[in-house]
Structures are given as C-alpha cells and as structure tokens.
C-alpha cells in the first residue's frame, strides 16, 4: 500500500518541521477510495489572438444527451479575466454550447463573463439569461484551481440544481436556476466548445485547462475527482464514485449518554429524511444528554456535511463536535446543511460526531450526515457505476498530433482550432499540470508541476494598457513609450534555475527591453525608471548590466560584449545557493570576462546576489512589441546547463511544508462557560494573541508559555499597561490549543473571537549567549522565538534568540509598568523603530526620545544567535531597566513560510495597486506605513473574512491591533498563492508614494499552489 501526499513523492516531502508530527494528518492510501497515483501529464494553453479568434476545442454531436443533468470537472490556471466584460477584453469563457453562432439562440456560458466572478448561465429562450454567479472573486493567476460544476435542474431543492465546487469546497452562488431548465449542453446536434463562447464566437479563453471531463446524465459529487491529501491541499484522483454506504446499519453505533428524546431515536438520523422533526436528539429532560455517532470503522472523507441545527440559546461551545473538535460555531441555528469540510482540526477520517441536548430550548440535533456526497442511510448500498452517458468525454491533451482525442470509451473526439503543437514558444501543449511529479533520471522534460508564468496581479500599469501578460501569461505586450515591468508568480528561493527570454525588437528611442530578476521589494510603479535607480534589480538591457545599484545608479552600459539581435533567445542561469547568475544568447554564454560556465560555477556575470526573494521579470516599452518568456513548461530553445532546472514549483524545497504546523489563525464564539477548548491547532502554542472582533470595547490579549497562566500573564497589544493576572481567561496551554476560563475578554457569551498562535518548539530553554539569561521557546524550523528576560540596566544588552538566522522582525514589551510596545523591522530606517499600543501606536517610524528612549538596535548588526537592545542617557524603560521583566518575540524570515518586507503605495491605476510577493499563500498579515503618520497598524487574516474559505477574495475585514476597535470594513486586499494584492486607496495600507512594512505568515508555500 502506497501512502500519497503528492504523486511520486514520499508522504512527507516538503513537510519537514511538522510540529504535531506526521501522525497529526490523515493520508489517504492508494487503495482507499480509488485515489491512486493519478497523473495529469499535460495541459493545453488557450490564447486569444483577437476579439473573435483564438484557441478552442469544438464538438458537434448528432446524438441526444441530457440537458438537465450533467457534470463538468476541469483544472484551470491563469487567465486574464480580471477585467472581463470590458470592451478591451470581453469575457473569458471556459465551456459553452449553443444552437449556433447567432446571438439569440439557445446557449450557455460557464466561465467569467463579468470580471472575476465565476458564472454558470443558461439562456434557453435565446433572449433571457439565468445567471448563477459566485460570491467569490477568482484573482489568483499563479495557482491551479479545480472546478466541478454539477447540474441537475430537475432537483426540487433550488440550490441543488447548480452546484459548484472549487478545490474541493462547495462555494456560495448568488442565485438559482429555474427547475427543469434545459441547458444547451447535452442538446442534440448543438455546438459545444471548450475555450470560447459558442453563442457569439467571442470571449476566447486566456488560461490553461487540464483534465477536462464531461459526464452526460450524471450529477456527481466533487469526491469523484479529488481528495484532501493534506490540510488545505486538494489533490486529483482517478475518477471514481466513492462508496460510503455498504449495507451498514449506522444507527447501531449511535448512542445517547442519558437516552434519546421521545420520538427522536438514533434511526431518525440515518433514514435519509430531511426536515420537520425527523431528527436524532438527546433526552433534554434528563439533562445533558449527548448523542454520539461513532462509525464501526473510521470513514475517510473528502467532503463532510451535516443536515441539522441547534437552538440559538445553546451557548455551550462544546455542544457540537466532529472528531472531538468543537464545531458549534459552524453548526448554526436553524435547520439546513452545515459544511464542515476542511475546518481547522477537522481532518479525515471521520471518527465521531456528537450533539448535546441540555434542557428545553438548548438542544442540538441532526437529520442526516453526508460523506462525499452520500447521505448515510441504514442498510443502503451505494452504486459506484461511473458513466459518461451518450455525449460525455474526457480530454487529457496527451497526443500532440490529436489533442482533441476523447479518452473515454465514447470516442467523442473534439476538433482543435487555433492550436499550435510545433516545438517552440508557440507550442500550446504544456507540462504545466496540477499533478506534480519529479523528473526521471535527471531528464527535466519529465517533470510536471506548476510552472512560473507572468503575474497579471503584479504589473506596472492597468490591465487594459501595455505591460499586460498574454499568451498563457508567458508574454508581455507593450504599446507605450514608458517602461512596463511585470514579475513572474514564483519566487526563486534556493536552488539552480534556468529560463529564456526572446528579444522582441531593436532598442532605440522608441523601443526597448530588459530581462532578469527583480526582488520582491522592487518598486513596480509607472514612475520607476531602472536606468536611474536599479535597486532590487539584477538584469540586462542589450549590453548593459543592472546590479542592484552596484557600480552606478542604473545600467552599466557596455558590460556585455554581445548585443542580442531581434528574435534571439536570451538565456539566464541563476544559482541562488551560490548567489551567482550568468547570461548569454542563442546557446552561447556571454564572454565579457573569462570563460563563463554555469555548470562549473565559473566566471559569473553577477555575484553576491540574494539566495531568496528574487523573481523572473520582463521590462518592455515600445510599439506593439511582444516580449516572450520560456519557463520550460513547453520546452526551451537551448539545453540548460547541467544541474539547472526549469521554472517549476516542483523544484522548490520549502523548509516548512504546511504553515498550520507552526502558525494558525482560529476563530471561535464565546460561551461564558469555563472549560471551553480552542482545540483546532496542530501544535501546542508558545505565543497567543486573542481579540473579540465583534466588539469595540474589548482589548487585545497576549499570552505566552514563558509567563504561563497565573500571575501577570496577560499583556495588551493596544495599550501600554503592565501585565495583568488573567487566570480566568486562559487556564491552560494544551497539545492542540488552550482552554478558556469565564473572563469575557476571551470568552464572552456574545463574543466572536479571533486567535493567532505561534509554535515555539517542544520545550523551554535557557539561553546564556548574551549579557543576560533568556528563557525562550524557539522553533528554529519556522524562525519563531518567544523570549523572556530581566533587564540589567546597561546602555546596551545582547540577548540570545536561538533562531539560527538573523531576525527580521522583533517585538518587545516590559511586563511591568506602563511602557511602550517597541517593534523593529528589518526595513526600518537606521536607528528607528515603531510603537504599537497606546497614543504612539499610529506614529511613523521614529528615533526614541525622552521617556520613550530605549530601542531594539538595527537588525543588520544582529547575529544568528543574538540581538541587541540599547538606549541613551540611562533611560531604558522600554527595553532594559535593571530588574524589569520583558517579553520579546523575535522572528527570522523563512522562505515559503514567513516574509518581512516593504512595499510602495500607489493609486494611479486601480488594477495596478501594489502586489506584494511572499512566496506563499498568506494566512496572517500585519502592516504599517513607515514614513507617514498618524496611521493605524492593520491586520488581515484568511479566517474571519469569511471563515477560512479557500481562494476567497476580496477580503475587506480589517483589524487594528493598536486599538480596541471591532473589526472594520476597509483596506481591502486579496490573498493569493504567491502573496497579497492591495485593493484599496486607504492611507493605512496604500497611500500614494508612501512606504509600508509588513510581516506575513503562510498557510501553504507556493510549492503547493495546486488545489490550495
């Protein structure tokens, strides 16, 4: 039996440093649920060449299907649908069918007809549309999404007629399709297309599609096509209907601690009936009767839902549990389906479900349990027959000479239009796929995964202007006399990399090109001229070299001895581990000095480069030029040097594979009852921040393992107050979280709370390398050190942090006395710091003066083992008063898990607001303007807004950690697989020309930007 985490890899590849250990995760085996080592070897690039031309796959079958019932499953990446619906771009249609190409015929549209909202639309009359639109906005151009669209319009339940899942999670849709509506899909002799709008021959797709499946006459659950291989990681499986019911009498293993309520026995929860009082319920008259279902054997699941409800007066948050995890917040009031898929702590397999009945008006119950789309019914046996029906098909795009081949038994082949399969940049068959597997015998053409493309979230100007990515985001169009830069969507963190650019035209007063690497800190704005300021840029223009401002403010003209001609392929080889890079053209490395050879590491053109945080990029200006990048997904023009790899995320090697093993955000509702456990964590926390976010009267609370749970254990982010004893607030640290007391600041019965927690290793140590002893909990894998020390009163004091790397973000606060919170960021100006709580919390960075003297010294002077605090004139209140106790939280940057950077505010183009590359999907972000005040700190997380849906954008719920305010609706952002995108003009996070610093921690690294 082979355990699968990622195809062709061991179960724990890329998942080192699991704080809870590998046993904390369920790994579905190859023999369970027909998952197996399913490979998707190719994708097809769909491109638009004009408003009415591009790539598509066409089919017209003179056979009747079922226009009321069908299922579509496909993987989708990239695309340029952010301004779909505008005259410049039109929509981007994924699949459609129509009676013909006239504008008023029976037709469908599935895709993005209006901006970035996914839509399932039908127009059976030819004149009246029925639209069912997502409430989410799909703005991640670097990740693979898995879509499943289930249509069953005969269903009597309105919201079951069109169901859409994305990456294994059912998403909310805005409306419902009328009962018995006939789609054009499934109609006899109608035209059907992948990649364009059939009804009017327009809206050609600009994206990659893979594994396109169409099941005629079947309404299938998402578990047919995928499963959760790790937290937040949806993985493709060999299509198979999952068998859950197998003649088992489920109610036999359903018990009630004090008996069942009259008329509500265990059988009521497993008879398949919904609604009314047909539910299983404990005897509330007996007091505290908990009904618990324990299956005879644990049930693996991809999706899990419960049809039931609870009374609004039931405040006990231990009342509803799955696998022992409290889920009462999600087991909402009133009858209906409750979705528990992928909640923190709720992982496959299912071992138990329980609901508590306390007294009259305080009960929880269920009517049905659904696993992978199958309701558990006593004695039932599921059919596992999977049929494509009459019109169904399966496009794998494997055969370059016959890309339209149907791999199902139907042989319903498709006709490719506008597709190129000849070798070269124009080849539309890509190895860019959602099932990564490693190269075989050092042959890079055998690797599969998510390849680096150009990032339409991260360009100099508006999407309707020049500088926009095209052709599957491997090209950039220029039609302006101003430089337009665009970065890729993959940060090169360690390793050896090779890629190519094609020279689009001659360089003169009207045209130009630049190629190379830009840092994630590069100021990607329309007024950024690298010829006068090349900071954070390593690249070339003709014979000029850009070297991060070294040797001049812009390019070093004449550095290279060859000038690549129009059409030449410029080569780059970057050894991140050695900090070296080489360039050349058409198979020959430039010989400006010595004998350059990337394979042996000799005579590089750049040295001393960063080992992480750099991104392949193109700069271009001119008249209708097309700059092209080759990432290796469809081959290279020239053979890479030995040991150098294409730009594929499968070669990334993040230290932390799952962010939730070291940092996590969890929301919970208070019940005012001592003993509630916040137990959705995969580790025992060393540092905890909590806040009631639906009230403006609640302070931020800070706990850590060094100070424990008794005396002076709670500090307040938003205030300078000394610590208070809050042993009725947090009563214990546990292996999977902590236990709450009755204090309303963390457990108010009407409160909604957010908690952020960091892992700090398995034990406390005493660090003696500095001037005073430091007690600390340190997670060196994830760059987290939770420290506690007593000041010695000296003007400078070294403190051991134990990170093994130089810290990039440090917070310190006196535990006693009304002293400031001090924050030092690696991008603070020299000798300057930030304040957090109190009246100074809105200040721009400053040099401490007067009573606020005392600071964290510049971090470029810190070492991998210790850092320094210092002051002047004997005034050290904030950092080192003799005999005063202090907490300090120090963080080092770990590529793929944490990022501590800066960005530049800009509001000139709404679609070109700042994009901040992180190399991961952020889980939590805290930021602040650096050079302008007064401005609040801001916090965004992917838990509150809304509660942890995958890929949800935009996020508008912001927290202000320097204030006690409730969450506010402002400072909108998007969180995507490789960073975050600002979506606002607020001075708090995007004042024009302001500089901002941020700290961000990951949910998952970009290596796993597939079904994430």
Each model region followed by its residue ranges:
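Extended recognition patches within non-cytosolic domains
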Residues: 2-15, 20-42, 49-52, 156-158, ...
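Extracellular, beta-strand-rich glycan-interacting domains
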Residues: 3-4, 70-80, 145, 151, ...
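Low-complexity, glycine/proline/serine-rich flexible segments
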Residues: 9-68, 117-119, 123-128, 188-190, ...
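Extracellular glycan-interaction surfaces
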Residues: 26-49, 73-82, 105-181, 546, ...
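Short surface loop/edge beta-strand patches of beta-sandwich-type extracellular domains
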Residues: 48-70, 128-138, 198-201, 282-283, ...
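Extracellular glycan-recognition modules
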Residues: 51-119, 156-158, 218-223, 492-493, ...
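Extracellular glycan-interaction patches encoded by glycine-rich segments
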Residues: 123-125, 185-209, 354-361, 985-987
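Charged, alpha-helix-forming regions
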Residues: 387-389, 416-424, 434, 438-442, ...
């Amino acid at each position: 039996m082979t355990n699968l985490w990622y195809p062709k890899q061991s179960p724990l590849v890329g998942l080192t440093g699991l704080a809870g250990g590998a046993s904390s995760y369920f790994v579905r085996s190859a023999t369970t649920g027909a998952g197996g080592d399913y490979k998707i070897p190719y994708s097809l690039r769909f491109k638009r060449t004009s408003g009415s031309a591009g790539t598509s796959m066409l089919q017209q079958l003179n056979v009747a299907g079922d226009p009321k019932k069908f299922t579509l499953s496909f993987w989708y990446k990239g695309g340029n649908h952010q301004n779909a619906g505008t005259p410049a771009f039109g929509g981007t249609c994924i699949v459609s069918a129509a009676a013909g190409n006239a504008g008023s015929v029976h037709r469908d549209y599935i895709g993005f007809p209006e901006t970035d909202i996914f839509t399932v639309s039908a127009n059976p009359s030819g004149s009246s549309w029925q639209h069912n639109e997502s409430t989410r906005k799909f703005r991640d151009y670097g990740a693979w999404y898995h879509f499943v669209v289930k249509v069953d319009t005969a269903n009597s339940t309105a919201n079951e007629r069109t169901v859409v899942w994305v990456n294994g999670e059912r998403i909310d849709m805005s409306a419902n399709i009328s009962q018995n509506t006939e789609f054009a899909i499934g109609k006899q002799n109608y035209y059907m297309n992948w990649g364009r709008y059939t009804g009017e021959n327009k809206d050609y797709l600009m994206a990659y599609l893979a594994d396109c499946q169409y099941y005629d006459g079947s309404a299938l659950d998402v578990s047919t096509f995928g499963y959760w291989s790790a937290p937040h990681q949806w993985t493709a499986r060999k299509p198979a209907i999952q068998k859950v019911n197998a003649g088992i009498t489920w109610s036999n293993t359903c018990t009630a601690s004090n008996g069942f309520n009259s008329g509500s026995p265990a059988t009521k929860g497993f008879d398949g009936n919904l609604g009314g009082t047909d539910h299983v319920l404990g005897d509330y008259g007996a007091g505290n009767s908990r009904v618990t279902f324990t299956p005879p054997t644990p049930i693996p699941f991809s999706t899990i839902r419960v049809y039931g409800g609870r009374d609004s007066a039931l405040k006990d948050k231990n009342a509803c549990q799955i696998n022992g995890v409290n889920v009462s917040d999600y087991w909402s009031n009133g009858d209906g389906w409750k979705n528990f898929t992928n909640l923190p702590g709720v992982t496959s397999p299912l071992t138990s479900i329980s609901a508590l009945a306390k007294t009259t008006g305080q009960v929880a119950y269920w009517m049905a349990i659904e696993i992978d789309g199958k309701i558990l019914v006593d004695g039932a046996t599921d059919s596992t027959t999977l049929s494509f029906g009459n019109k169904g098909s399966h496009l794998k795009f494997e055969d370059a000479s016959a890309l339209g081949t149907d791999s199902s038994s139907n042989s319903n082949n498709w006709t490719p239009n506008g597709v190129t399969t000849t070798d070269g940049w124009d080849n539309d068959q890509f190895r860019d796929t959602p099932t990564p597997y490693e190269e075989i015998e050092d042959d890079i053409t055998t690797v599969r995964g998510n390849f680096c493309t150009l990032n339409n979230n991260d360009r100099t100007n508006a999407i309707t202007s020049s500088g926009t990515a095209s052709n599957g985001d491997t090209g950039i169009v220029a039609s302006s006399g101003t430089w337009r830069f665009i970065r890729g969507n993959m940060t090169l963190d360690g390793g050896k990399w090779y890629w190519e650019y094609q020279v689009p035209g001659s360089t003169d007063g009207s045209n130009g090109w630049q190629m190379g690497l830009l840092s994630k800190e590069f100021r990607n704005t329309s007024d950024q001229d690298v010829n006068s300021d090349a900071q954070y840029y390593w690249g070339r223009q003709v014979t000029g070299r850009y070297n991060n401002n070294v040797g001049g403010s812009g390019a070093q003209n004449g550095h290279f001895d060859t000038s690549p001609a129009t059409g030449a392929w410029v080569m780059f080889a970057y050894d991140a581990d050695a900090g070296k890079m080489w360039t050349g053209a058409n198979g020959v490395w430039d010989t400006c000095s010595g004998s350059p050879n990337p394979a042996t590491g000799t005579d590089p053109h750049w040295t001393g480069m960063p080992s992480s945080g750099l991104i392949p990029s193109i700069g271009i200006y001119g008249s209708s030029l097309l700059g092209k990048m080759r990432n290796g997904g469809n081959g290279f023009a020239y053979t890479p040097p030995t040991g150098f790899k294409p730009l594929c995320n499968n070669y990334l090697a993040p230290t932390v594979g799952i962010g939730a093993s070291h940092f996590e955000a969890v929301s919970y509702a208070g019940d005012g009852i001592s003993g509630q456990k916040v137990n959705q964590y995969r580790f025992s926390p060393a540092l905890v921040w909590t806040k009631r976010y639906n009230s403006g009267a609640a302070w931020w609370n800070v706990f850590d393992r060094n100070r424990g749970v008794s005396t002076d254990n709670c500090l307040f982010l938003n205030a300078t107050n000394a610590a208070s004893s809050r042993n009725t607030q947090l009563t214990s640290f546990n292996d999977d979280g902590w236990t709450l007391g009755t204090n309303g600041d963390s457990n108010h019965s009407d409160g909604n709370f957010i908690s952020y927690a960091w892992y700090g290793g398995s034990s406390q140590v005493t660090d003696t390398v500095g001037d005073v002893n430091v007690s600390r909990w340190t997670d060196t894998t994830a760059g987290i050190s939770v420290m506690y020390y007593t000041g010695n009163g000296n003007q400078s004091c070294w403190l051991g942090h134990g990170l093994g790397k130089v810290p990039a973000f440090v917070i310190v606060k006196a535990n006693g006395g009304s002293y400031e919170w001090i924050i030092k960021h690696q991008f603070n100006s020299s000798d300057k710091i930030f304040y957090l709580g109190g009246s100074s919390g809105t200040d721009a960075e400053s040099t401490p003066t007067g009573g606020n003297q005392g600071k964290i010294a510049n971090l470029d002077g810190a070492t991998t083992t210790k850092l320094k605090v210092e002051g002047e004139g004997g005034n050290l209140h904030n950092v080192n008063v003799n005999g005063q106790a202090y907490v300090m939280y120090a963080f080092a940057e770990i590529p793929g898990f944490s990022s501590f950077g800066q960005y530049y505010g800009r509001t000139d183009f709404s679609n070109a607001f700042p994009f901040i590359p992180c190399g991961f999907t952020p889980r939590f972000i805290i930021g602040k303007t650096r050079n302008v005040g007064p401005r609040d700190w801001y916090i965004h997380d992917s838990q509150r807004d809304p509660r942890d849906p995958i890929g949800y954008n935009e996020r508008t719920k912001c927290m202000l950690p320097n204030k006690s305010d409730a969450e506010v609706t402002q400072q909108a952002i998007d969180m995507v697989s490789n960073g975050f995108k600002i979506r606002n003009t607020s001075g708090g996070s995007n004042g024009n020309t302001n500089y901002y610093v941020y700290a961000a921690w990951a949910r998952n690294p970009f290596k796993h930007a597939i079904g994430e």
